[in-house]
Amino acid sequence: MIQDNFFPLFPHKHLLAIKDLSVQDLNTLLDRAEANVILSNKIDKTKSILRGRTQINLFFEASTRTQSSFELAGKRLGADVISVAIGNSSVKKGETLFDTAATLNAMKPDILVFRHSSAGAAALLAQKVDCCVINAGDGAHEHPTQALLDALTIKRAKGRIEGLTVAICGDILHSRVARSNILSLNALGARVRAVAPSTLLPTEINHMSVEVFNTMKDGLKDADVIMMLRLQHERMTGSFIPSTREYFHYFGLHKENLTYAKNNCIILHPGPINRGVEIASDIADGPQSMIRTQVEMGIAVRMAVMEALLDSRLKINGEKK
């Protein structure tokens, strides 16, 4: 296995957004994650870099995949992991986010994994605490670890990212996953497409370095990678589609639409899946689907992020392990 000392220094205290990272930063995290994938195939999947360290998961939005992935990543690195149940917390009694942050900061954690429905909340929190903050999703803004695990999934399946055509399809307007992936994939040399009805595209889409398509036939033509996104009804305040049935016919991924892409294309989805809305069950469970692989890569990536942040903190501040 590659030793931590062989990786370039990750020059950040927090991981808040893909837009903050250079190409070298992205590749450093992906290389670290590759080493963790190798580790995950061994009987002993653990490391000790976070032994004696505390990781707090603070999720203001419901999560199964992401929170469980961070919990397992921290435990595999030897951390003491605490997940705060917001439903039973002081937040429900009227405590503000910043008061909660001050309380947690007084406990002197080393890593705070944070998810919130408001864009920019993670960056604000990072200003109020002394520990490393990892953004696990802030509103429709960014979800950096999802973009990293998607990049790792693509790289391992295709052997590269540069030069590939990646079609991101669905509710791009409300998707933090889309925004982070557009940034990371462009930086890593992919050709990125946004495929959606005009009602589900952000107004700034023409300034996001993507090709825009309003039909699956045109958007999926010769695609190497298809990334499907769910309709985020919880962020919608009006009617964006006529019906889910019509949406699936025109913008869902089913056998007919899949024929427009390359025969060896791979299919990604960040989850949760709405079968029969944005993707057919036989496609989600088919041989081209990388959905389960994404879950596996998520643990490796989140381990890599925590390793890199702590390694940076130790070297920059001269702290002892």
Swiss-Prot record:
Encoding gene (name): pyrB
Species classification: Bacteria, Pseudomonadati, Pseudomonadota, Alphaproteobacteria, Hyphomicrobiales
Record note on quaternary structure: Heterododecamer (2C3:3R2) of six catalytic PyrB chains organized as two trimers (C3), and six regulatory PyrI chains organized as three dimers (R2).
InterPro entries associated with the record: Asp/Orn_carbamoyltranf_P-bd (IPR006132), Asp/Orn_carbamoylTrfase (IPR006130), Asp/Orn_carbamoylTrfase_sf (IPR036901), Asp_carbamoyltransf (IPR002082), Asp_carbamoyltransf_Asp/Orn-bd (IPR006131)
Enzyme class: transferase
HAMAP family attached to this UniProt entry: Asp_carb_tr (MF_00001)
Organism from which the protein derives: Bartonella tribocorum (strain CIP 105476 / IBS 506)
Sequence positions that bind carbamoyl phosphate: 65-66, 115, 143, 146, 271-272
Function, as annotated: Catalyzes the condensation of carbamoyl phosphate and aspartate to form carbamoyl aspartate and inorganic phosphate, the committed step in the de novo pyrimidine nucleotide biosynthesis pathway.
Record-linked PANTHER family: ASPARTATE CARBAMOYLTRANSFERASE, ORNITHINE CARBAMOYLTRANSFERASE, MITOCHONDRIAL
Residues reported in the UniProt entry to bind L-aspartate: 93, 176, 230
Reaction(s) the record says it catalyses: carbamoyl phosphate + L-aspartate = N-carbamoyl-L-aspartate + phosphate + H(+)
NCBIfam families membership: asp_carb_tr, PRK00856.1
Keyword Transferase: yes
Pathway where this protein functions: Pyrimidine metabolism; UMP biosynthesis via de novo pathway; (S)-dihydroorotate from bicarbonate: step 2/3
Gene3D superfamilies in the cross-refs: Aspartate/ornithine carbamoyltransferase
An annotated Gene Ontology molecular function: amino acid binding
Protein name: Aspartate carbamoyltransferase catalytic subunit
Pfam family of the protein (one): OTCace
Record key words, sorted: Pyrimidine biosynthesis, Transferase
Protein family (similarity comment): Belongs to the aspartate/ornithine carbamoyltransferase superfamily. ATCase family.
